[in-house]
Amino acid sequence: MSWAWPVPGVIVTLHLVALALYGLATALTLAPFVGFRPAPRALTIAIPCAGAAVHVVAVSQLTLVGLGPALSMLALCLVLLQLASERLVRGSAVSFFAAPLATGLVGLAILSGLAPGAETVGARNTWFVLHVALSALGLALMALAFIAAALYLLQFRELKARRFGQIFQLFPPLERLDQLNRVALVAGFPALTLGVLLALGYGAQFSGGLHVAKAQIVWGIFTWVVLGWAVWVRVVRHWAGRRAALASIAGFGAVLLVYVALKLTQPGAERFL
């Protein structure tokens, strides 16, 4: 008699544990804004670190094909970037948006289904795994740039109105948020570019590999163009501050809207698009 637990069950359980830890981290992050005392910084870092460790184990068991696995990988990249960025801004303000977003992505991944689908030929190929990982990293960095921009505008509004409440006290200075936005964009563009190039190379090298829908190609190219434009206005045109923040938010919003529009034309939880 075998006592081995089916792999799909293990994957879902690990994601549920990560979801619980991310949810707890979200509650601790939002607590000061609803009147509770801020949690110790060591705790606000340890809990998402534990969630990320469990999440890494879960993702390592996945076949990276379909909507659920893609959302899971994106959530993991976002949490890891959240933890890394807290050192740059010297505070936990990034988790104000990143923690709820990562929690929601993991929840959606579980609801969408994490079991391997029928289209798994070549899914463990190194080219394909790198394509998914780098593409998810590029999107997560774009989301991080959006988060930094949103935090910048919130802090800017508080300063302009001369309100020195919780937002002013808990959010980093504007200069650090602007720097985080720039770093995220500049790092995200090459990551996404490599992800797109690996997808093209994979398709050319392995003609019998995974099917790529036209919607995926359209959205991938559109996202790459938008991210490239955001980097161009920051690096070449030297946009900064409020104008750069608005550009990042507009770009991220456009990418989301196009994704939703394409997804509605081709519904189905078994594929990313």
Residue ranges of predicted features:
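Alpha-helical transmembrane segments
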Residues: 18, 130-150
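Central hydrophobic cores of alpha-helical transmembrane segments in multi-pass inner-membrane proteins
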Residues: 19-31, 49-58, 73-85, 225-229
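Interfacial loop-to-transmembrane junctions
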Residues: 232-254
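Membrane-interface helix-loop-helix junctions at boundaries between adjacent transmembrane segments
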Residues: 62-138
